[in-house]
């Protein structure tokens, strides 16, 4: 085997190496008789839903190659690699008739060495009737749920091979008549070089590092009846005003290491292999791997397309209390298979793109992600 092919083969093995490493970590966790109780202890899980359909189709490994407006979400450092202003809008048909939407815009300046961007994401559903044990047919009242975050990003190229970025964001969680607010930071780096004249990129991302959410509002108000002491006569009185106190909940902080390598890097076509290892506060360590085939200037035109697929693994979260083993092993994966594709057109500084991704959510079924992007 030639030195050239040996290097590329070694890199692909390294990318796929995330697979046994992740499986070993899961087996070690199960062998130590520790169940995965971190899941469900964090608030604002919608922060993990994603941004662009391209990133959703490529799973957790995408931060290594995110260089458009979606980098504001996936890796702030990638925004510094943008060659032109870019805007992106996405909509996600989530489960149980809920919908997640995301939008971002970014502007390079200072000769393209620095980029400033803004993003907003929201998850919610329409008004629903309120049912109680005393009024199972409905109280006549209605409630809604809306979770929103907004962020500002600043990213910069510190050399021709290294960029870094930071995002500050505010998170608002409105659950009917109860609500809470938190603040968080995202940090990201991107190291880009070449191996045997083929691009290679490393990314390190720390996301959702911030304050806890504590809920308050009218939903926590309660009337406390007066209870007489033993031996005392009951004293008629109206319930006294009171309020339940809630525990504060942390955000789903995530640390991610991603690697991407262009196995094929021709003038108008590219095959990229990606791998990722991640650790969330709400779950045990996980990993993902994926690939993307992209072609541009089809037939000498400005049209191009991309095809993507990935698999993201996170330890199952349904633990049998008797055997301490996974109860629904295959169906309880946080993420599974994701596939997608997109069409784009470029002419000079103008670019437009449409992308789609399908992500399997285990027992929750399949979900669809659509994205429209514009560059100028």
List the model feature ranges, each with a label.
Residues 70-78:
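N-terminal periplasmic accessory domains that precede
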Residues 60-63, 85-94, 357-359:
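Short strand-turn segments of transmembrane beta-barrel domains in outer membranes
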Residues 26-55, 99-100, 104-376:
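Outer-membrane beta-barrel porins/channels
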Residues 1-41:
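Cleavable N-terminal export/targeting peptides
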């Amino acid at each position: 085997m030639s030195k050239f092919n040996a290097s590329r083969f070694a890199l692909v093995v390294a990318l796929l190496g995330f697979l046994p490493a992740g499986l070993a970590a899961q087996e070690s966790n199960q062998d130590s008789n520790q169940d995965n109780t971190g899941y469900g202890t964090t608030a604002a899980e919608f922060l993990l839903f994603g941004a662009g359909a391209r990133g959703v189709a490529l799973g957790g490994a995408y931060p290594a190659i995110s260089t458009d407006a979606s980098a504001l979400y996936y890796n702030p450092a990638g925004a510094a690699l943008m060659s032109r202003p870019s805007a992106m809008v996405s909509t996600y048909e989530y489960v149980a008739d809920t919908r997640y939407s995301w939008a971002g815009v970014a502007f390079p300046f200072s000769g393209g060495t620095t980029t400033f961007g803004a993003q907003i994401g929201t998850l919610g559903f329409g008004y629903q009737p309120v049912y109680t044990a005393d009024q199972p047919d409905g109280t006549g009242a209605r409630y809604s749920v809306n979770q929103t975050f907004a962020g500002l990003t600043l990213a910069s190229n510190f050399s021709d091979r290294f960029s870094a970025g930071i995002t500050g964001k505010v998170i608002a969680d409105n659950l009917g008549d109860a609500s809470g607010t938190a603040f968080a930071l995202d940090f990201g780096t991107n190291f880009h070089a070449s191996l045997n004249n083929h691009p290679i990129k490393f990314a390190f991302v720390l996301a959702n590092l911030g304050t806890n959410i504590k809920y308050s509002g009218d939903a926590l108000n309660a009337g406390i009846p007066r209870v007489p002491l033993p031996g005392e006569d009951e004293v008629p009185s109206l319930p006294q005003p009171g309020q339940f106190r809630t525990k504060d909940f942390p955000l789903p902080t995530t640390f991610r290491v991603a690697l991407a390598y262009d196995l094929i890097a021709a003038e108008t076509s590219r095959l990229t292999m990606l791998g990722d290892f991640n650790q969330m506060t709400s779950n045990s360590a996980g990993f993902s791997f994926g690939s993307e085939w992209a072609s541009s200037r089809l037939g000498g035109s400005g049209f191009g397309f991309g095809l993507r697929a990935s698999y993201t693994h996170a330890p199952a979260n349904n633990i049998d209390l008797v055997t301490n083993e996974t109860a629904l092993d295959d169906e309880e994966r946080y993420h599974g298979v994701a596939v997608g594709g997109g069409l784009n057109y470029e002419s000079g500084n103008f670019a437009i793109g449409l992308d789609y991704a399908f992500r399997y959510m285990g027992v929750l079924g399949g979900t669809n992600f659509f994205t429209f992007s514009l560059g100028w």
